[in-house]
């Protein structure tokens, strides 16, 4: 590479530099700066005031010097409570509620991701194999819930699953049950609404990957004697791995920090870290 080409690569036009700078500015403003603020608070001491933590630095006007007060007590409490949580002979009453709820959040998010994958994969596969008109209609049906408020959709489930909701009233009128079922404020309702809310985020990445699958590969596998199941595990599934990873990340990451659904339909026994931090 000659000097001129190297110079052109290092000193691009201002427009190109501006375009490249946009994602870095986005990360700086929305991730690095908030992370730095939280990191600063973690080294402060708690107090009943506004803001509810002590400043890390203060100026002594009499002596004219800068005082730095860094506390490691928050980190000591984390490790101590973490040990109490894991130790079967430890003080379970002092176990850190944040660690327990974070573990509960991971389990709930993992369950949601697995169920979304099991439902979303065949759905995305069926959409990708439909004709163009049917495909557009099915994609519209997947996107249709996003046209309404997320909060309204959660409230709709409250009307369906509640003690006096539509499902219980229907079953009582049909004399299928004698008393209303406990469909609300439990793990069942939490997982059900979580799957409903995040299922489109699994289907769409899978669809974009499966729709690009070359049918000639499946035809060649069939000509060589491979059955549908073997063709799926040797061709379709490996080629859709990127969509599986993308969909799983889009579901798992926001599901861990979800607080609206646990607050409205999860009840007091199904705590998640987003709900605890919000409260």
Describe the residue ranges of each PLM region.
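Membrane-interfacial helix termini and adjacent extracytoplasmic/periplasmic loops
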Residues: 3-9, 56, 154-195, 229, ...
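N-terminal signal-anchor/first transmembrane alpha helix
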Residues: 1-41, 126, 136-142
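Interhelical loop and adjacent transmembrane-helix boundary motif
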Residues: 11-16, 49, 59-62, 72-82, ...
């Amino acid at each position: 590479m000659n000097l001129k080409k190297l110079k052109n690569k290092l000193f691009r036009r201002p427009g190109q530099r501006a375009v490249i700078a946009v994602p870095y500015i986005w990360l700086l403003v929305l991730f690095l700066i908030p992370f730095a603020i939280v990191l600063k608070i973690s080294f402060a001491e708690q107090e009943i005031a506004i803001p509810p933590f002590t400043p890390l630095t203060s100026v002594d006007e009499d002596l004219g010097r800068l005082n730095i007060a860094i506390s490691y007590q928050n980190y000591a409490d984390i490790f101590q409570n973490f040990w109490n949580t894991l130790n079967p002979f430890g003080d379970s009453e002092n176990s850190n509620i944040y660690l327990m709820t974070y573990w509960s959040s991971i389990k709930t998010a993992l369950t949601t991701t697995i169920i979304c994958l099991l439902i979303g994969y065949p759905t995305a596969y069926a959409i990708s194999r439909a004709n163009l008109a049917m495909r557009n209609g099915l994609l519209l049906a997947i996107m249709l819930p996003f046209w309404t408020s997320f909060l309204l959709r959660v409230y709709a489930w409250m009307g369906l699953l509640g003690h006096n909701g539509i499902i219980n009233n229907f079953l009582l009128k049909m004399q299928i049950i004698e008393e209303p079922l406990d469909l609300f404020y439990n793990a069942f309702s939490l997982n059900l609404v979580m799957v409903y809310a995040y299922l489109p985020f699994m289907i769409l990445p899978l669809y974009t990957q499966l729709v690009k699958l070359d049918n000639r590969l499946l035809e060649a596998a069939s000509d060589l004697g491979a059955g549908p199941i073997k063709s799926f595990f040797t061709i379709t599934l490996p080629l859709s791995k990127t969509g599986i990873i993308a969909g799983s990340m889009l579901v798992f990451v926001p599901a861990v920090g979800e607080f609206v659904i646990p607050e409205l339909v999860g009840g007091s026994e199904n705590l998640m870290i987003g709900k605890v931090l919000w409260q």
